[in-house]
């Protein structure tokens, strides 16, 4: 199974779909809009955490900038009646933090406002994901809460570090530590990489 791809984007015209060139081989990868719009156009290589689904007639690759979003995707597709397409729709329509809060608060009514989610599916999500989202309590939810108060440069730097394979909470800690409020995104990334690579 493919779990990670690192390469250069050669096609990114349709939201949620891209082609990643890895050593001369182009991989069709589907992403959530959350991941898609964090990826900047350009020649910089990126890394994506991949979930692979093998079917008789297709090999489907779903890509995520951070492991936590991929883990949330995997938890979603375990719910009865939720397939990869609907899971991607959910992750494209609501942030991981907001989704986790909905499950914690058993807010099925808000979930029904998401595309493709009816009342029964929303209730099933709340019931079946109650236990599985506990793994995210110290990662996704905290990370998104902390990033909410970050500067734009910090958020850009954190996203770039995540794309390079660093964990969101690890990237946030380092960027927050070195930022004095006056540094550009490029400076933050460069200094953060120096610290992270020396560990």
From Swiss-Prot:
Q: Where in the cell is it found?
A: Cytoplasm
Region described as Domain II: 66-144
GO MF: ATP binding; four-way junction DNA binding; four-way junction helicase activity
- Keywords annotated in UniProt: Cytoplasm, DNA damage, DNA recombination, DNA repair, DNA-binding
Looking up SUPFAM superfamilies in the UniProt record yields: DNA helicase RuvA subunit, C-terminal domain, Nucleic acid-binding proteins, RuvA domain 2-like
Is-annotated flag, keyword Cytoplasm? Answer: yes
Can you supply one Gene Ontology CC term for this chain's record? cytoplasm
Between which residues do disulfide bridges form? none
Q: Where is this region: Domain III?
A: 149-199
Q: Would you say which domain of life the source belongs to?
A: Bacteria
Q: Where is this region: Domain I?
A: 1-65
Q: What is its main location?
A: cytoplasm
**Region described as Flexible linker: spans on this chain:** 144-148
GO biological processes: DNA recombination; DNA repair
Domain comment (free text): Has three domains with a flexible linker between the domains II and III and assumes an 'L' shape. Domain III is highly mobile and contacts RuvB.
Q: What does this protein do?
A: The RuvA-RuvB-RuvC complex processes Holliday junction (HJ) DNA during genetic recombination and DNA repair, while the RuvA-RuvB complex plays an important role in the rescue of blocked DNA replication forks via replication fork reversal (RFR). RuvA specifically binds to HJ cruciform DNA, conferring on it an open structure. The RuvB hexamer acts as an ATP-dependent pump, pulling dsDNA into and through the RuvAB complex. HJ branch migration allows RuvC to scan DNA until it finds its consensus sequence, where it cleaves and resolves the cruciform DNA.
Q: Subunit notes for this chain?
A: Homotetramer. Forms an RuvA(8)-RuvB(12)-Holliday junction (HJ) complex. HJ DNA is sandwiched between 2 RuvA tetramers; dsDNA enters through RuvA and exits via RuvB. An RuvB hexamer assembles on each DNA strand where it exits the tetramer. Each RuvB hexamer is contacted by two RuvA subunits (via domain III) on 2 adjacent RuvB subunits; this complex drives branch migration. In the full resolvosome a probable DNA-RuvA(4)-RuvB(12)-RuvC(2) complex forms which resolves the HJ.
Family annotation (NCBIfam families): ruvA
Q: Of which family is this protein a member?
A: Belongs to the RuvA family.
What is the name of this protein?
Holliday junction branch migration complex subunit RuvA
Origin organism of this chain?
Legionella pneumophila (strain Corby)
């Amino acid at each position: 199974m493919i779990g990670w791809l690192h390469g250069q984007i050669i096609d990114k015209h349709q939201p949620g779909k891209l082609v990643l060139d890895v050593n001369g081989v182009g991989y069709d990868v589907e992403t959530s809009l959350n991941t898609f719009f964090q990826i900047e156009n350009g020649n910089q290589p990126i890394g994506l955490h991949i979930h692979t689904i093998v079917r008789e007639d297709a090999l489907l690759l779903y890509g995520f900038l951070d492991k936590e979003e991929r883990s949330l995707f995997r938890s979603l597709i375990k719910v009865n009646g939720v397939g990869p397409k609907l899971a991607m729709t959910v992750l494209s329509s609501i942030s991981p933090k907001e989704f986790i809060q909905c499950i914690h608060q058993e807010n099925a009514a808000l979930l029904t406002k998401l595309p493709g989610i009816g009342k029964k599916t929303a209730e099933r999500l709340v019931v079946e994901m109650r236990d599985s989202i506990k793994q995210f309590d110290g990662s996704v939810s905290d990370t998104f809460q902390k990033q909410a108060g970050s500067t734009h440069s910090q958020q850009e730097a954190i996203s770039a570090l995540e794309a390079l394979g660093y964990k969101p909470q690890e990237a946030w800690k380092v960027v927050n530590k070195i930022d004095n409020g006056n540094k550009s995104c490029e400076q933050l990334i460069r200094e953060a990489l120096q610290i992270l690579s020396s560990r």
